[in-house]
């Protein structure tokens, strides 16, 4: 029994034990927002990991509608029970692939595949042998923000109580 088969058996057992009713497959769209494909647990089987779940990639910003047939391949190693779902739900992340006559291949613009290629390039070029990628969630709160654009000038003005210039 290979590692994936063992993990799939573990997932099936977890679904029975936790009375899972839905399987939620998570991916990011081209802008980095979470997207979901959700199926009832009855439709979930080993073929899901082999053939994936088909979806229209144009809805996610991945492809024009004429070439939008894509497949989501779940990664069993990412499975967990969603503690916030109102219905018992198992969640998994995975990979997005394009459908081709030669078989499915990873979609080169999917953020996960971009990062995998970056890691591969880094290792091949000898830059490093390990990479840590972390998103930086950053935002600013302004009390006022104004801008002006005229034929001779443009500019902006921002102000916030927390700014150094507002403290004496």
Which residues make up each language-model segment?
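Glycine-rich, acidic/polar active-site loops that bind/position phosphate-bearing ligands
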Residues: 1-168
